[in-house]
Amino acid sequence: METYGLEKLGLVNAGAVYRNLTPAQLVEHALRRGEGTLSNTGALMVKTGKYTGRSANDKFIVDTPAVHDDIAWGKVNRPIEKAKFDAIRAKVLAYLQGRDVFIFDGFAGADPKYTKAFRIVNELASQNLFIHQLLRRPTAEQLKDFHEDYTIIAAPNFKCIPEIDGTRSEAAILVDYEAREVVICGTQYAGEIKKSVFSVMNYVLPKQGVFPMHCSANIGKDGDSAVFFGLSGTGKTTLSADPQRMLIGDDEHGWADDSVFNFEGGCYAKCINLSPEGEPEIYNAIRFGALVENVVMDPDTREFDFDDDTLAVNSRVGYPVEYIPNAELSGMSPSVPKTVIFLTADAYGVLPPISKLDKNQAMYYFVSGFTSKVAGTEIGVTEPVPTFSTCFGEPFLPLDPSVYAAMLAEKVEKAGAKVYLVNTGWNGTGKRMKLGYTRAMVTAALTGAIEKSEFVTDPTFGVQVPTSIEGVPAELLIPANTWEDKAAYEASCKKLAQSFAENFKKYTHMSPEVAAAGPKV
């Protein structure tokens, strides 16, 4: 029986070994094995158990002399000894003996100059379906002569024993950059596999002069590209899905000398409160070949209830980018971005809905990675909680933040790109900015129409704020104008400015010019 070189990994005596099956074959296997259920749209639905999101505290990086000085060690990048990694890896390989395994050999990185080959070894057919749809799929020719650069082994039903294995829980995501391997066990949340690929790209690409980004990207009719950075829930997917523009991708990209390229060949979208009116592209992508995680489904009609968060608030669907009508299937733009947009949702109501940043401000707000979470009313907390995630992607960045910030500045300067901070959050009226207005502002930035406006300097944040944009009421553009109580406005400005300053203290490698570009406290 063909083993496709698994013995090189040390995986011997596996059951049946399947390689690069089609989505239809993988769905058949998953159903036969009881891994999931078929919905009325044809999508496969699985429940991932207690892990319905990334388990950030269970991720470890193997600390070896070859990588030690590269990694920004801390609460995100926790070290684990090589001996402990090897011991867990050996147990996982022993666990897989006698079990069927599913291999997907594919690629990350649409630009052939920077493509990395990944071998994913899955215990579950449903997870293999997911990664088949999320990564870039090889042609038959490429598969014949495939040599992986990195290997990821995912065995969700293998549980670690923290006292013996030195992990924090039964789940572990273990990255060995030197050995070019990742081992994932104890968690069935498929996003762990996708984000492990991303973490590898974030480690290797800067060494090749490519800036890796946690962003969405699209292209206009003239070939002009734009990138949208932002944390979860700020509008990356929604705002980059524009009928006037082609979608390059929704989550992970590289900025090279002459293009922006998608790392992936698929999308991983949130499903909560999904509707055909609100997000038709995503809604219509939930069909045969898509993998849905943790959405409540009627056992008889097999219809999804996207509003029910009983299984998870972070319910998701993975599907190939081909399922989106205006996707740019090459996964590349013909040129570098002319527009960079940082999305934030400010619950204090004091950041302008759109503002222009200079080079130092761009680095400051990029490194800060600000948004805010509004606490749930069930615990009676009404105060917004400022959230900072370095470079809009802290959990996935192995190198020091200053590396990524310097790359952003260099790429923006070289491309002559304009950088805008867009607040999709609240203003002084207590209402969230209407999506239609935000779209009009983003369009003005993408077309350059915004440059025709007069700009004023925000007194607290120092950013340049336009005084007029077509289709947006002028009073909404200046935050102070939306507040009746000016003293409350000043107090909120001060509070947010202090949060920024406090958070920025940890970035000791940033230049004094960048540190001075933040809000005035």
Locations of regions flagged by a protein language model:
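N-terminal accessory targeting/assembly segments
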Residues: M1-K144
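Glycine-rich, often acidic-flanked micro-motifs
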Residues: E2-A43, K50-Y51, P206, H214-L231, ...
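Gly-rich Lys/Arg/Thr-decorated short loops/hinges at beta-loop-alpha junctions or inter-strand turns
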Residues: H68-W73, D176-E181, V385-C391
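Charged, amphipathic alpha-helical linker segments immediately N-terminal to NTP-binding catalytic cores
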Residues: A155-V204
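Conserved lysine of the Walker
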Residues: K236
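Hydrophobic positions on the alpha1 helix immediately C-terminal to the Walker A/P-loop
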Residues: L239
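Generic C-terminus detector
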Residues: L476, N481-V521
